[in-house]
């Protein structure tokens, strides 16, 4: 996969593909045969600060932690991006989707893993 600009994080993309975040850039998507499909910023007009961790949920939506903007954003298959979490995040680096539907966020600012269910942080 060539043409990347400062690749930082790689994660599963929709339909068996890959998603790659670029430092202070965009998030590029690749198909299951590793062919370039485009970028989330290009498709949605979303401007990233510093995209970091990436995951895909069971519906095939891509979720991105943005370290600089201190938020986690969901990119649905259709429609505009949706900010899932912004309050209480200091430096979100990693994200993961748990099988039970929870969203896990690694926050490097306070050295914690935050667990969200239905967009509310669980204790």
Curated annotation (Swiss-Prot):
The keyword Repeat applies. Keywords: Repeat. It comes from the Eukaryota. Pfam families: NHL. SUPFAM superfamilies: NHL repeat (SSF101898). NHL repeats lie at residues 35-78, 79-119. This is NHL-repeat-containing protein 4. It comes from Homo sapiens. The gene is NHLRC4.
């Amino acid at each position: 996969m060539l043409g990347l600009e400062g690749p930082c994080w790689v994660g599963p993309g929709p339909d068996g593909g890959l998603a790659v975040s670029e430092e202070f850039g965009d998030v590029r998507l690749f198909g299951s045969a590793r062919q370039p499909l485009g970028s989330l910023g290009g498709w949605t007009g979303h401007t990233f600060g510093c995209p970091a961790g990436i995951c895909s949920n069971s519906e095939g939506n891509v979720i991105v932690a943005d370290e600089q903007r201190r938020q986690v954003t969901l990119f649905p298959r259709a429609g505009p991006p949706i900010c899932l979490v912004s309050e209480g995040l200091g430096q979100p680096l990693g994200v993961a989707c748990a099988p039970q539907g929870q969203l896990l966020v690694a926050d490097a600012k306070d050295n914690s893993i935050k667990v969200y269910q239905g967009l509310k942080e669980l204790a």
